[in-house]
Swiss-Prot record:
GO terms for molecular function: ion channel regulator activity; toxin activity. This is U11-theraphotoxin-Hhn1l. It is found in: Secreted. It comes from the Eukaryota. The keyword DNA-binding does not apply. Belongs to the neurotoxin 14 (magi-1) family. 01 (HNTX-16) subfamily. Its main location: secreted. Keywords: Disulfide bond, Ion channel impairing toxin, Knottin, Secreted, Signal, Toxin. Residues 1-21 form the signal peptide. One of its GO terms (cellular component) is extracellular region. Probable ion channel inhibitor. The presence of a 'disulfide through disulfide knot' structurally defines this protein as a knottin. Residues 22-74 form a propeptide.
């Protein structure tokens, strides 16, 4: 029983005496490791961010081209006001001259043929 207690006390004293020495070294090592981690993150960020910005620019460019050429931008649907000189109604629709007299009916609208 006494040898167990003595062994425990010896191991305990060795652990306590070596503990503070490790604590003095660990903060410096931890600072170095965190600095290395930050350097790796900055390096990765410098590689990824320009590629993401380039990809975003390409997507925005494609989106703007698509919206310019979309049918809704080029054509006008049924019941929508149109210009008599430049009728851009959908296929199957025409832009006839207004038939009813009145203030509200003086503009041209796209109607079915």
């Amino acid at each position: 029983m006494n040898t167990g207690r003595v062994t425990f006390l010896v191991v305990f004293l060795v652990a306590v005496s070596l503990g503070p020495a490790d604590k003095e070294e660990n903060p410096m090592e931890m600072q170095e490791k965190t600095q290395q981690g930050k350097n790796y993150l900055n390096f990765g960020e410098n590689l990824v961010v320009p590629k993401l910005e380039e990809l975003k620019a390409k997507l925005v460019e494609k989106e703007s081209k698509k919206s310019k050429n979309s049918r809704q931008k080029r054509c006008i649907g049924e019941g929508v006001a149109c210009d008599e000189n430049d009728p851009r109604c959908w296929s199957g629709l025409i832009c006839p001259k207004p038939t009813l007299p009145g203030i509200w009916d003086k503009s041209y609208y796209c109607y079915k043929k």
